[in-house]
Regions:
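N-terminal pre-domain/capping segments
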Residues: 1-87, 156, 217, 236, ...
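Tryptophan-centric aromatic hotspots in well-structured domains and transmembrane helices
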Residues: 10-12, 32, 63, 127-128, ...
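Acidic-and-aromatic substrate-binding clefts and catalytic sites of carbohydrate-active enzymes
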Residues: 13-18, 34-47, 64-72, 95-99, ...
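Generic structural signal for well-ordered alpha-helices
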Residues: 24, 45-49, 73-77, 108-115, ...
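Conserved beta-strand positions in the central sheet of alpha/beta enzyme cores
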Residues: 36, 61, 89, 126, ...
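Active-site acidic/histidine proton-transfer and metal-coordination neighborhood
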Residues: 66-157, 177, 260
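Acidic/histidine-rich catalytic cores of soluble enzymes
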Residues: 120-228
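C-terminal/domain-terminus segments
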Residues: 243-273
């Protein structure tokens, strides 16, 4: 059974800031079934809920900064519960929180606490990976350590298939590894030249001093179906794993493209696969 397709609104964040509701309407017009938020831009949760219901698009989830959720989870998460989101997501870890640092153990415990707060509000916490979670701890990927430490009812996966591939792991196989624990999967495509990938996090709008120096044009995010990812295999893995949603995300457009056209091309490609 084909799964519904949502879009991570970070992909069109500048458009969201300029015209919040108009941009969500455009996502509906492009054929997206749902949206995943990346900020509410000062809009009222009740109004967002009503608008989504009116146009027939589902607010499935939201990326919420880790520290915001950790410091005041009930207040921060209640907005998304009011909107009607089923999921909230840890989207990214700053350098001091990551595996390989002294802060990682505290981060794992913090994620557990957020998961408990989310559960109390009727929300399910997910974790959205990058590539830095694929360092090993005692022979095991740090991402697997996170999932084996925090119980499944408090934390499920939001596997970003681009970053899994960048880390050198087969994304379809990794999605299936977490069958029954992968309700939402990020579809993201890319192309690269050479082995040195440059400052990848600049491309997602984050300044990260831990990155390598940039090699021009070595890496580019692409619309889904326009890069190196085996999208049909990933989609089949999502179905096999029992996923509920796939989410298109493109952190930055390819050269000479625009964010709106990027998400349009991604949706059109998925339609050619009858998704």
């Amino acid at each position: 059974m084909k799964l519904p397709v949502a879009v991570q609104l970070y992909s069109v964040r500048d458009e969201m800031e300029k015209d919040f509701y108009g941009t969500i309407q455009k996502m509906k017009d492009l054929g997206y079934d749902g949206v995943e938020f990346a900020g509410l831009f000062g809009e009222e949760p009740s109004k967002i809920k009503d608008f989504c219901a009116e146009i027939g698009i589902i607010p499935i989830s939201a990326h919420v900064p880790y520290y915001d959720m950790l410091e005041n989870p009930e207040k921060v998460l209640s907005d998304y519960a009011e909107i009607g989101c089923k999921y909230v997501v840890v989207p990214y870890l700053t350098e001091e929180c990551r595996p390989g640092t002294d802060g990682f153990a505290a981060t794992v415990e913090g994620i557990r606490k957020i998961g408990e707060a989310a559960k109390a509000l009727g929300l399910q916490l997910l974790y959205h990976n990058h590539d830095f979670e694929f360092v090993t701890i005692d022979g095991e990927y740090a991402l697997d350590v996170l999932y084996s430490t925090v119980p499944s009812d408090l934390l499920k996966t939001e596997i970003d298939t681009c970053w899994v591939n960048v880390a050198g792991v087969n994304p379809a196989e990794y999605v299936e590894k977490y069958s029954g624990r992968s309700p939402v999967v990020h579809l993201k495509d890319f192309k690269k030249s050479g082995d040195k990938l440059g400052k990848l996090y600049d491309l997602i709008g984050i300044d990260d001093d831990a990155q390598e120096e940039e090699e021009e044009d070595s890496f580019s995010f692409m619309p889904v179906g326009y890069g190196v990812q085996d999208i049909p295999a990933i989609l089949a893995a999502c179905e096999n794993a029992g996923a509920e949603w796939v989410v298109v995300e493109q952190d930055s457009p390819a050269k000479n493209d625009t964010p709106l056209n990027s998400v349009k091309l991604s949706r059109e490609y998925l339609k050619t696969l009858n998704w």
